[in-house]
Curated annotation (Swiss-Prot):
One of its GO terms (molecular function) is structural constituent of muscle. It comes from the Eukaryota. This is Myosin-binding protein C, fast-type. The gene is MYBPC2. Residues 641-737, 739-834, 935-1030 form the Fibronectin type-III domain. It comes from Homo sapiens (Human). Residues 50-153, 255-344, 345-437, 438-538, 539-638, 838-932, 1048-1141 form the Ig-like C2-type domain. InterPro entries: FN3_dom, FN3_sf, Ig-like_dom, Ig-like_dom_sf, Ig-like_fold, Ig_I-set, Ig_sub, Ig_sub2. Residues 13-39 have a biased composition (Basic and acidic residues).
Length: 1141
């Protein structure tokens, strides 16, 4: 049984330190530290290498009863692959948690800068039961480490008179040690009270701080259950507990009502059902069930069952409310138990999704878990989000059934990052990207052509109502005046010019504040003039597109409006005709139309398209002549989507995306690409780059291993962004495992080498399919695979190697992501058998004589060691074995000696020799095959005296090849010949049979007993033992006759009676006397003679007077008198007759 060790005692600071000086109590904030101790003997180091994850191990502490204890430890997060799981234990296996009580609290914090985890254990108001050995365990994936410490609980400090120092108080409420006056009222107690407290304290020390109900449970439990109960209730001082129980010497009372009680505790998962069963001694006893002292009534949740003497309570669909104490009551007896309802692990049903939002948007990050009302922890960039900080950070939590939502009402740039949700059964994470809000133009400004004194209205609409802006005319800001009005209503911005004048003509621009955006339109002033030109003038086209090129060219963006205003002159006014190639345009309405004015011809395209690109010709004619001009219209557009988008390689949290440039660049060279990513099944795309990426290969990072993703690409040119490409096939970031660990050589022969290793430290979501082993000759760089298919176990034997060569070996892990980094031996291995001297490992049961019965199998397995394979030889008495009876099979590690049916001839000494060249080892095995012995011989009755007989015999001729253990003697009467046992396992060849019956004649028989049992047949005595009768004188006893005479005596007197008139009545009494007395019945002192109303009977001294249908006249005093020669006796009673009303 393990024993908890107390904390080490502190050494005194100096030699002169007084022995009785009180120890200073450690402050609450900094518990006293004790020297570090070696771990207990039962905490032996494991075979694994130490991980060294503790920067500061918990120290053993010593604390006074009633004080608080604090234990602190620090864990190095750099040594851990993931966030660690922290567990505290008392003793070896008792885990401290929410069930441990409110006195135990746990705290955990993480410093992200240094990656150090600080964990604390707080125990409030410690009691004596808290002392003992504790253990801290840290686990993260495959990494596990633990360390132990002790908590020693001391009694409160006292002064020299035995008074507790806490009795001295100060009247002031200040925290200073010298403030106020000392108050000694706490010491004004009677001496008897102090003595009682000392006795109570001593009793508490004897009880080891264990509650009385636990002592009662231990007293009624079996010794084999002590350790189980101790671990269940956190008792670590097992030796003290056993001593206390031994002193108690309590006689366990057997329950009169229960034959089987409830177990001390039960555990069930929430939502499941559980059955509590007791067995009572009497099936007719009434039984009641109670929960926390309240009686349980039958319902659909609580079902009662009676099966024979068993009484079963079934609790259906257990909830946390069913976590309580239960008891069963039968009469005055009760038995108790406690039910613990265990919360199932909370799983992530719908994980978080990546989101990309703008500043000021409302954001809801939702996750759905498997249990309603479950506790989840939100974290941002590794830091926990709490409700206390929610007021400062502008976020709040919301629960909607199984959905947990983190809400940002007005998101800002500081809220971006990676958010994580952690439950006790899983976790998920997502990234929140916050961008500056982009302004969207909902309605652009249109060009205006107005006449004099008319009103011009420029109007635009943007996506943000709060955005303000300024108006400009030809680059000069427009100021409001009597004619000019500027308004801003919601998303609409207006510029109104009343009474338009020629100087109002120009380019008007609206520029929103804070955005690199401008909206422009042109105001054309239409002036009507009537002039008379008496002369004729040939037509002339006034066209100038660039002024610098010989060829007129115009560039328009697809989707935009194009308006070509061409001024023409001539008299009379010429007629303008527009052509595209040979096609003539004549329409004045529609998307493409012609507008005509006096001195201008306009060609309008409402929404330019790619097919509108080409050379346009305008021809003007009048009677005087004609003029022709051509314009090349180039329509530019956003490019087509990129092509052949695919994933070429993936890693643990990254993937390589490759694509081809678009077939059509939109008339402008492609300046770069934009990449987006999303989780499969999600609708939210997340931008990966905000600046255009010029290459066609992109590496995406910060991905979650084991999650399916999709990606797409946009092409960008000077015009804008293309449509998205086709989504890539779903892919999953998976990395190869890390290299295998601890590669060693286990065995080497002339042609083989056996390697062993341990699994990789990091396996990842892709798992591991197996391992590949490769070898390379020293001096060569070519690695030869030793196995084509991966092996699953962490060991492999490489065969067919050249003898004497020096070879280097390496092992790689393989999974769906590919090969891991290799684990290579530090030094080459020489392929040569390592000679090992032979050694026979004779089993313990073969080191002494091996005994078997005739007919049984002889199957001996003898292991040995030695390299190369030794030569094994079996002999018996120096001669070879008879192969017709004995079969021998030898392997590299053992030899088997087998006989199917053993015979006595197989007994003897066998020699086993194991030899390698000139080295040899031998062993001797002694085998004895036994059977039943023969019967004893010459069984004779040697002497008879009194009721005794002496029987002798000789040992059997065949002892069955085994030592005779004794003889079995029986006797039989010659008359009945029924055999009765006299002696069992009598070791001598003679015995004296006593207590034989006089006058009988006896036979005797004897069996021989050895290790196989009694002999099949007995040895029967040839003569008999006759027990003769001896002479006896009979003296009769003297007979004295007894005098049976006695005077009459009433054994049962008469009793007073009250009867109802008309119903027969009887008066009874009993009398004894010898000779038989004469009986006389009287009424009111008058003898009752032969009256038919009365019937007198006498049966064996029982006297009865029957009165037929009595009337009130029959009431009175009745007397019975009994008389014989020795005397008389009287008995009387009163009879009352009542008439019914």
């Amino acid at each position: 049984m393990p024993e908890a060790k107390p904390a080490a005692k502190k050494a005194p600071k100096g030699k002169d330190a007084p022995k009785g000086a009180p120890k200073e109590a450690p402050p609450k904030e900094a518990p006293a530290e004790a020297p570090k101790e070696a771990p207990p003997e039962d905490q032996s180091p494991t075979a694994e290498e130490p991980t060294g994850v503790f920067l500061k191990k918990p120290d053993s502490v010593s604390v006074e009863t009633g004080k608080d204890a604090v234990v602190v430890a620090k864990v190095n997060g750099k040594e851990l692959p993931d966030k660690p799981t922290i567990k505290w234990f008392k003793g070896k296996w008792l885990e401290l948690g929410s069930k441990s009580g409110a006195r135990f609290s746990f705290k955990e914090s993480h410093n992200s800068a240094s990656n150090v985890y600080t964990v604390e254990l707080h125990i409030g108001k410690v009691v004596l039961g808290d002392r003992g050995y504790y253990r801290l365990e840290v686990k993260a994936k495959d990494t596990c480490d633990s360390c132990g410490f002790n908590i020693d609980v001391e009694a409160p400090r006292q002064d020299a008179s035995g008074q507790s120092l806490e009795s001295f108080k100060r009247t002031s409420e200040k925290k200073s040690d010298t403030a106020g006056e000392l108050d000694f009222s706490g010491l004004l107690k009677k001496r008897e009270v102090v003595e009682e407290e000392k006795k109570k304290k001593k009793k508490d020390d004897d009880d080891l701080g264990i509650p009385p109900e636990i002592w009662e449970l231990l007293k009624g439990a079996k010794k084999s259950e002590y350790e189980k109960i101790a671990f269940q209730y956190g008792i670590t001082d097992l030796r003290g507990m056993l001593k206390r129980l031994k002193k108690a010497k309590v006689e366990v009372k057997k329950s009169a009502a229960f034959t089987k009680k409830l177990d001390p505790a039960y555990q069930v998962d929430r939502g499941n059902k559980i059955k509590l069963m007791v067995e009572i001694s009497d099936p007719d006893l009434t039984l009641k069930w109670f929960k926390n002292g309240q009686e349980i009534k039958p319902s659909s949740k609580y079902v009662f069952e009676n099966v024979g003497k068993k009484r079963i309570l079934t609790i259906n669909k257990c909830t946390l409310a069913d976590d309580a104490a239960y008891e069963v009551a039968v009469k005055d007896e009760k038995c108790f138990t406690e039910l613990f309802v265990k919360e199932p692990p909370v799983l992530i049903v719908t994980p978080l999704e990546d989101q990309q939002v703008f500043v000021g948007d409302r954001v809801e990050m939702a996750v759905e878990v498997s249990e309603e009302g479950a506790q989840v922890m939100w974290m941002k960039d590794g830091v926990e989000l709490t409700r206390e900080d929610s007021f400062k950070a502008r976020y709040r939590f919301k629960k909607d059934g199984k959905r947990h939502i983190l809400i940002f009402s007005d998101v800002v740039q500081e809220d971006r990052g990676r958010y994580q949700v952690i439950t006790n059964g899983g976790q998920c994470e997502a990234e929140l990207i916050v961008e500056e809000k982009q302004l969207e133009v909902l309605q652009d400004i249109a060009d205006l052509t107005v006449k004099a004194s008319e009103q011009a209205v420029f109007k635009c609409e943007v996506s943000d109502e709060k955005v303000t802006g300024k108006w400009y005319k030809n680059g000069v800001e427009v100021r409001p005046s009597k004619r000019i009005t500027i308004s801003h209503v919601g998303r609409f911005h207006k510029l109104v010019i009343d009474d338009v004048r020629p100087e109002d003509e120009g380019d008007y621009t609206f520029v929103p504040d804070g955005y690199a955006l401008s909206l422009s339109a042109k105001l054309n002033f239409l002036e009507i003039k009537v002039e008379y030109v008496p002369k004729q003038e040939p037509p002339k086209i006034h066209l100038d597109c660039s002024g610098k090129t010989s060829e007129n060219a115009i560039v328009v963006v697809a989707g935009n409006k194009l308006r070509l205003d061409v001024s023409i002159t001539g008299e009379p006014p010429p007629v303008a005709t527009w052509l595209k190639g040979d096609e003539v345009f004549t329409t004045t309405e529609g998307r493409t139309r012609i507008e005509k004015r006096v001195d201008c011809s306009s060609f309008v395209i409402e929404s330019a398209q790619r097919e509108d690109e080409g050379r346009y010709t305008i021809k003007v004619t009048n009677p005087v002549g004609e003029d022709v001009a051509s314009i090349f219209l180039q329509v530019v557009d956003v490019p087509d989507p990129p092509e052949a988008v695919r994933i070429t390689s993936v890693g643990e949290d990254w993937a390589i995306l490759v694509w081809e440039p678009p077939m059509y660049d939109g008339g402008k060279p492609v300046t770069g690409y934009l990449v987006e990513r999303k989780k499969k099944g999600s609708q939210r795309w997340m931008k990966l780059n905000f600046e255009v990426f010029t290459e066609t290969t992109y590496e995406s990072t910060k991905m979650i291993e084991g999650i399916l993703y999709e990606m797409r690409v946009f092409a960008v040119n000077a015009i804008g962004v293309s449509q998205p490409s086709m989504n890539t096939k779903p892919f999953m970031p998976i990395a190869p495992t890390s290299e295998p660990l601890h590669l060693i050589v286990e065995d080497v022969t002339d042609t083989t080498t056996t390697l062993k290793w341990r699994p990789p430290n990091r396996i990842g979501a892709g798992g591991i399919d197996g391992y590949l082993v490769e070898y390379c000759l020293e001096g060569s760089e070519e690695w030869v695979p030793a196995n084509t298919e991966p092996v699953e176990r962490c060991g492999f034997t490489v065969k067919n190697l050249p003898t004497g060569a020096r070879i280097l070996f390496r092992v790689v892990g393989v999974n769906i992501a590919g090969r891991s980094e290799p684990a290579t031996l530090a030094q080459p291995v020489t392929i040569r058998e390592i000679a090992e001297p032979p050694k026979i490992r004779l089993p313990r049961h073969l080191r002494q004589t091996y005994i078997r019965k005739v007919g049984e199998q002889l199957n001996l397995v003898v292991p040995f060691q030695g390299k190369p394979r030794p030569q094994v030889v079996w002999t018996k008495g120096g001669a070879p074995l008879d192969t017709s009876r004995v079969h021998v099979r030898t392997s590299d590690f053992d030899t088997v000696f087998f006989v199917r049916q053993a015979a006595r001839s197989d007994s003897g000494e066998y020699e086993l020799s194991v030899q390698i060249e000139n080295m040899k080892d031998t062993a001797t095995i002694r085998i004895r095959v036994v059977e039943k012995a023969g019967p004893p011989i010459n069984v004779m009755v040697k002497e008879v005296w009194g009721t005794n007989a002496l029987v002798e015999w000789q040992a059997p001729k065949d002892d069955g090849n085994s030592e005779i253990m004794g003889y079995f003697v029986q006797k039989a009467d010659k008359k009945t010949m029924e055999w009765f046992n006299v002696y069992e396992r009598n070791r001598h060849t003679s015995c004296t049979v006593s207590d034989l019956i006089v006058g009988n004649e006896y036979y005797f028989r004897v069996y021989t007993e050895n290790i196989c049992g009694l002999s099949d047949s007995p040895g029967v005595s040839k003569n008999t033992a006759r027990i003769l009768k001896t002479g006896i004188t009979f003296k009769p006893f003297e007979y004295k006759e007894h005098d049976f005479r006695m005077a009459p005596k009433f054994l049962t007197p008469l009793i007073d009676r009250v009867v109802v008139a008309g119903y027969s009545a009887a008066l009874n009494c009993a009398v004894r006397g010898h000779p038989k007395p004469k009986v006389v019945w009287m009424k009111n002192k008058m003898e009752i003679r032969e009256d038919p109303k009365f019937l007198i009977t006498n049966y064996q001294g029982v006297l009865t007077l029957n009165i037929r249908r009595p009337s009130p006249f029959d009431a009175g005093t009745y007397t019975c008198r009994a008389v014989n020669e020795l005397g008389e006796a009287l008995a009387e009673c009163k009879l009352e007759v009542r008439v019914p009303q």
